[in-house]
């Protein structure tokens, strides 16, 4: 029977956000040491659950070390990295001689105060420990589809396995697939990884797996895998555009049991497919006026109009409190609006006033100067809750980050004749309708729903929508990447 060392270190880092991500952010999302890494993940629908369920079903002994995850946000404070490395490497030093494999749940786009490549740094240190002890142990890592993959990650791992769907409905499945690869490696199978970075940095709105260019590149990768039994797997990684690092961008990775030259030729083919469909990866967005004009021209039908605000894409790291769309929308005088804003200060005011109270609030745009200005909203406090909810889509994009139970902190619902607004104390990406349903809000019955996302909302919201329009606003997850003050993307392409 096999013994596997297990750890998780997951964060998607936005270089342009002013607030750093400290240890407290991990403790607020997932911070599990030792046996808690099993107890708090097994059965929760996350990638960790996928690995653990597979490992235990095969009778492996799992040695849990530390599993940490935080919501996308600013650069990670070095203290958090030290805590992870201290716990993990103490366990590795102690257990190295008895383990048959190492399994890691990573993101692939983690940046700290002092490292542009946290995952590469961790993997290199693992390799150094194993080499010092004269051990050959396979190291398998799960990556997010939005990973910015470095050569160091590839050189210091045995096999990397990335999500294939965006929204990330296959995150748990990917960990299962990676665990099966680890089983093969522990049984003596050899693979070589071939990595191919590209110069293309695509915004999140341009990398949904059901649209070009991802659709064609992913389909071509699956055809290659099916045709060549030497190929263990091909990763198509869209990259995460808001990490200002040299390795930012679209990349490809092939794990092969056969000749490296053939694997490299396959990656050349995939780059050609990407380039043939590249224009769709830089989508154009509407002004609010244009979106409303198009919405007004639609025939009558059931379901709301989705007004997508990718520049305040909570799943991409932004604060979730931008008012650049909601404010002007309210100013039009339209009604039937549903929106969610992260505003703990406003939640406390609602709690103090109590359910049923009439209240005037200044909501939104309090975290930084990049996401509009606070707007005045007068209405009735309809609901106050602890903000906890269960996901309705158990394999949703959100489950890939936190499992199937969510906590948006103390929350309040305020309403007037124009809008119903959910106010939260913790930012929560709109990836599951349970977020609104749990608070008594029915987006299905709205005329307009403001959605702070890029692609990750689609599995939840598209089925209820009459139409969907992407609206260009000024936030730090803008799809117009040339607006951002990059310093390290030498030779990269940010637009058509």
Regions inferred by a protein language model and the residue ranges of each:
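Glycine-rich phosphate/diphosphate-binding loops that line cofactor/substrate pockets in enzymes
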Residues: 1, 56-60, 64, 90-100, ...
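Active-site histidine-anchored catalytic micro-motif
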Residues: 5, 9-11, 18, 78-85, ...
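Internal, active-site/partner-interface "lid" segment
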Residues: 186-215
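N-terminal amphipathic/basic leader segments beginning at the initiator methionine
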Residues: 1-57
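Short, solvent-exposed amphipathic alpha-helical segments in soluble enzyme
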Residues: 21-23, 120, 268-272, 321-333, ...
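Hard-cation-handling environments
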Residues: 205-418, 422-426
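Extended hydrophobic packing segments that form well-structured cores
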Residues: 45, 64, 275, 392-496
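Low-complexity, highly charged intrinsically disordered N-terminal segments
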Residues: 52-80, 84-92
